[in-house]
């Protein structure tokens, strides 16, 4: 029987606590500094243990967190089999939740590894995206975050006006038009109002100007990303769907990554959290709750906005929405989720077929298509 060195790691910003064991032997507790030098020393020590055990294989497990996948990359590069586990799929008893320590967490991960090696139990692992996908996610998420900040600043401006009993003139219409911007700038310079109001409003307007410029830069970066060989064909196909823009397509592609890991529409729907919770026990076998909201929330947000755009246009999704709402007018949210699920499955089918095609993109045709998709005014999540 092959020998294994199994390591359960509780990872933190500055330290790592390891529980190291060989097969069924008792575990050894090791504390490591979470620095480059500390991790290099840890890898060397584990390799020395494996060599002393007659060339044993090393298995390493830690929970996914805000630390990212840097540790996974270092271990994999050193030839160590690393598993990144999903914290939400690791069952913990009530007693374990009451008494939580780093050592107990590392011990639990070690036991999961042991059960995997010795009994063949599956590990609740997460999919580890490649370095390029992670890098692409950063710019897409930055664009989403900037849009959220812009929306929050506009809400602050409205709140400031409301607190000071300043009503928007009806002649300015609705929305953040040039006329409305001009009126706000005039208020920020009007000496008839207090210094505090003018200073606060001027500060908020400067921040809005800055974020508007940033959104333009980020939109250009997204346009360039969408025209890259990795996403060109898929984005061109996806933006042809009603309600789906370049940003929505890129959020979908970068957050989901390898689309072939989903075998069918049920798996993609469950991963995105647009399926209902289930409460079945005994004769009560048809109790459904709210959606699970598992998976990337960013994808659900853009799907929701795209779904509302599709509902406003004639088509099968509008008919599906109206069919549910007609039965019960209170089920508008349920109908929206149904449209979101239909759209997600359709996007998955299209993107999977596009990414599996051997032929490369056609930059000339693609550029004009995407430029048209991005020509509309910036939307928070469009």
Residue spans for each PLM region:
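Short alpha-helix plus adjacent loop in nuclease-associated cores
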Residues: 83-125, 285-294
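Short glycine-rich, Thr/Ser-proximal phosphate-binding strand/loop in the N-terminal lobe
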Residues: 13-41
């Amino acid at each position: 029987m092959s020998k294994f060195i199994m390591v359960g790691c509780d990872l933190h910003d500055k330290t790592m606590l390891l529980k190291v064991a060989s097969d069924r032997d008792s575990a050894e507790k090791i504390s490591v500094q979470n620095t480059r030098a500390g991790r290099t020393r840890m890898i060397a020590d584990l390799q020395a243990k494996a060599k002393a055990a007659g060339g044993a294989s090393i298995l390493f497990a830690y929970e996914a967190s805000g630390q990212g996948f840097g540790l996974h990359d270092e271990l994999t590069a050193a030839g160590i089999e690393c598993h990144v586990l999903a914290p939400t799929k690791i069952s913990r008893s009530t007693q374990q939740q009451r008494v939580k320590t780093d050592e107990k967490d590392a011990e639990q991960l070690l036991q999961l590894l042991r059960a995997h090696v010795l009994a063949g139990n599956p590990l609740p692992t997460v999919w580890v995206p490649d370095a390029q996908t992670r890098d692409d996610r950063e710019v897409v998420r930055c664009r989403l975050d900037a849009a959220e900040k812009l929306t929050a600043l506009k809400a602050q401006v409205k709140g400031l006006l409301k607190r000071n009993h300043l009503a928007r003139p009806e002649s300015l219409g609705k929305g953040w038009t040039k006329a409305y911007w001009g009126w706000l700038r005039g208020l920020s310079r009007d000496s008839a109002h207090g210094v505090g109001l003018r200073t606060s409003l001027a500060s908020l307007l400067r921040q809005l100007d800055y974020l508007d410029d940033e959104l333009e830069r980020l939109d250009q970066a997204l346009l360039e990303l969408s025209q890259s060989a990795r996403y060109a064909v898929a984005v061109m196909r996806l933006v042809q769907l009603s309600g789906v823009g370049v940003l929505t397509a890129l959020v979908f592609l970068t957050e989901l990554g390898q689309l072939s890991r989903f075998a069918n529409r049920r798996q993609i729907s469950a991963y995105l959290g647009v399926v209902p919770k289930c409460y079945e026990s005994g004769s009560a076998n048809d109790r459904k709750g709210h959606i699970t909201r598992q998976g990337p929330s960013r994808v659900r947000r853009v799907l929701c906005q795209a779904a509302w755009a599709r509902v406003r246009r004639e088509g099968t999704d509008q008919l599906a929405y109206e069919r549910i709402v007609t039965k019960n007018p209170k089920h508008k949210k349920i109908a929206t989720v149904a449209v979101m699920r239909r759209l997600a499955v359709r996007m998955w089918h299209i993107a999977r077929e596009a990414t599996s095609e051997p032929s490369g993109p056609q930059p000339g045709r693609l550029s004009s298509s995407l430029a048209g998709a991005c020509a509309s005014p910036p939307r928070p999540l469009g």
